[in-house]
């Protein structure tokens, strides 16, 4: 049976439309595809991503160092092809962070503490013989206060004898410093190694008698508790430990204070808790000069140092006010790109706190401080002070001058 005229006409129309598609649209598909090729190839994008990335290993998220790394990332990051990208990495802290910089392939920088070089050399003199040549500091960041939070039945460090005390994670900076402190005091304790959150839970339940954290105050876990929880900070000074010789501790650590402003729920207004502190440093692995990794860290340093003033903001951690990029660290070598930047920017602010730096190294101020030291020596009977003791006195001297200036301006 043959096709009707209408059916044949419909088939002709369909065939014509199909041929139209083939000869008009299909030939243009290669042009369409060509116009939508990616701007860069997969391999090029991969190269760009790696070219701008630098890593910095910190401790846990409750550590002040982690907050600092986040602040640096937020201020410094530039994800353009020629920018710089900071990738914070959560580590353990302390000696482990320094080992991570030394031995892990993809770690460029770390936040460590000042005493780490000395402790590693003491631990294995052969392995770490030239560690100061392989890891060098970029800048000091802040002072890390030694916090010991104890139950109310514990009145002093002596009361912790044979009690359960949490030293934080193994090889963390807290554990390293706590080892030094309790060994120096010759107070034996039952040590545990819980993370901060677990330790706080066990402290409040009475399972342990005290927990220790070494970090820049305020520490977020401790800031959440209050006196009503039955805990308090233990003081660490000669008055609170009259039967102990603390000269060894204060030869290696800074005298410090924990204040009401830092922990208003734990410390009464107008009072302070004496303790010790360590210095937290930003350090880098010393890649060969002008190598790709070396140049990336140098680029990061330029971006970070150039924007240091942007970190003095209420939205940033209050410890940024302690940062002075030009501060020297005895026993450490400065990473060359950092030293070169400071030499080239002598007249530029090198502190996140504009009120903390100007004039502090002026000859007049140094002369006034020398007179203060002379008066101190004659009144106390002590003829010499350690570098750390002089630094603390000078900091207090600056504070007194600032307060006097503010009072005079208010009159």
Go through each PLM region and give its residues.
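Pocket-lining segment of extracytoplasmic ligand-binding domains
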Residues: 114, 124-125, 187-290
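Short Pro/Gly-enriched coil loops immediately N-terminal to beta-strands
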Residues: 131-145, 226-228, 275-278
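Bacterial N-terminal signal peptides
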Residues: 13-27
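N-terminal (or domain-start) structured segment
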Residues: 36-111
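Segments of small-molecule ligand-sensing domains
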Residues: 274-377, 383
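Pocket-flanking alpha-helical
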Residues: 73-74, 87-129, 200-202, 219-226
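Bilobed "Venus flytrap"/periplasmic-binding protein-like clamshell domains
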Residues: 51-79, 84, 143-205
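N-terminal secretory signal peptides that target proteins for export/translocation
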Residues: 1-11
